[in-house]
């Protein structure tokens, strides 16, 4: 899930109250530190001190960036024309929280981004400290690393060391996804925004592979999509089971027992998936913390409306017309646009995409 930069931090501090000042200060410091560390990609490529492998990856990003503007109609601006070596595994860490017996996530509201289902920190320690506060209040909590995010065109989003080594298909997917947020973004509607970006990334990578993917690249990305599809299906299955459990007319203790059984089933079935994948362990990080509702709450944000957006794109048969139709849809009230997307996607099956919202490669 991509945390939207708090680009109006000064205003936010004034309106957020004393309890929020520390949070907004770290957000402002983190964003501007990121920008100060970025240098133009061409400088990195021409520098004798840049390793050959990094030069190759940065050259690939330039090709992907040009393709995004030329073939996909995505914004042709300064985003992803600079590079920053952060010397850490993630650009930030998101905190997601839900009640103990519910999948409905807490929301935090910010300028520009509106209300979102997560709270981002540039420091893992600060994210974990806030997560501990929420756990003390009996919330289910997840802390997940984020490799990239979008400032919605307010700043020059840099290419980062946190994702530059991704294989070509996954690198293109991420760039297309983040640029899509600059095309259409509705403050306070994460499910709409993320599902739209997933639909764009899927269409974009398909076109990229047709024109630029060799057999090895296509095979690698195909395997990636199959694993992601399998894992998503498992998560959706257990999310459905949890929803049914929390709706039962039984005691909270009974719900807690069934909740534990569902999460154990999730772990057991994941081990079977790993065996079927030949031991691939890329999703092991998802189980690094004790499983909770928070882990599964984000699945709806990144999946539920993707089928509807796919149906819209199939009908328009042109990305420009698709973007225009999505912009028109975005002007409706939230309930109505959700209703229309749900109706469009009713008959569409699940396929893989950036549906997990974090670094689930």
Predicted segments, located by residue:
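Acidic/His-rich structured neighborhood in mature extracellular/periplasmic domains
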Residues: 64-228
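Bacterial Sec signal peptide processing site at the extreme N-terminus
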Residues: 16-39
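Sec-exported extracytoplasmic/periplasmic mature domains
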Residues: 46-50, 59, 63-73, 180-184, ...
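Acidic/histidine-rich, surface-exposed loop or edge segments in extracytoplasmic proteins
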Residues: 35-52, 106-116, 289-290, 307
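Pan-zinc metallopeptidase signature
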Residues: 235-361
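Bacterial N-terminal signal peptides that target proteins for export
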Residues: 1-7
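Soluble non-cytosolic domains of exported or imported proteins
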Residues: 32-35, 44, 48-62, 121-125, ...
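Bacterial N-terminal signal peptides
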Residues: 7-16
């Amino acid at each position: 899930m991509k945390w939207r930069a708090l680009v109006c931090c000064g205003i936010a501090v004034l309106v957020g109250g004393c309890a929020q000042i520390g949070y907004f200060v770290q957000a402002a410091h983190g964003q501007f530190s990121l920008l100060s560390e970025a240098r133009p990609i061409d400088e990195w490529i021409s520098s004798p001190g840049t390793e050959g492998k990094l030069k190759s990856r940065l050259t690939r990003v330039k090709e992907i960036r040009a393709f995004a503007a030329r073939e996909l109609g995505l914004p042709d601006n300064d985003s992803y024309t600079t590079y920053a070596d952060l010397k850490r595994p993630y650009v930030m860490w998101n905190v997601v929280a839900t009640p103990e017996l519910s999948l409905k996530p807490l929301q935090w509201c910010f300028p520009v981004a509106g209300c979102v289902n997560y709270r981002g920190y540039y420091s893992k320690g600060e994210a974990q400290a806030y997560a501990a506060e929420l756990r003390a209040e009996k919330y289910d909590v997840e802390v997940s690393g984020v490799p990239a995010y979008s400032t919605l065109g307010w700043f020059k989003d840099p290419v980062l060391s946190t994702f530059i080594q991704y294989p070509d298909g996954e690198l293109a997917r991420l760039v297309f996804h983040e640029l899509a947020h600059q095309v259409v973004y509705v403050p306070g509607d994460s499910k709409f925004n993320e599902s739209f970006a997933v639909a764009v990334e899927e269409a974009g990578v398909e076109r990229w592979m047709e024109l630029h993917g060799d057999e090895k690249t296509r095979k690698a990305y195909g395997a990636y999509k199959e694993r992601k599809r399998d894992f998503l299906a498992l998560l959706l299955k257990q999310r459905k089971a949890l929803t049914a459990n929390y709706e039962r007319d039984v005691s909270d203790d009974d719900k807690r027992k069934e909740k534990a059984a569902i999460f154990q089933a999730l772990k057991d079935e994941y081990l079977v998936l790993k065996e079927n994948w030949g031991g691939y362990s890329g999703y092991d990080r998802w189980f690094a913390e004790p499983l909770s509702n928070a882990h599964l709450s984000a699945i709806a944000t990144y999946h539920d409306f993707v089928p509807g957006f796919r149906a819209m794109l199939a009908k328009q048969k042109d990305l420009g017309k698709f973007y225009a139709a999505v912009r028109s849809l975005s002007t409706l009230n939230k309930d109505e646009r959700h209703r229309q997307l749900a109706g469009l996607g009713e008959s569409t099956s699940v396929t893989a995409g950036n549906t997990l919202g974090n670094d689930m490669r």
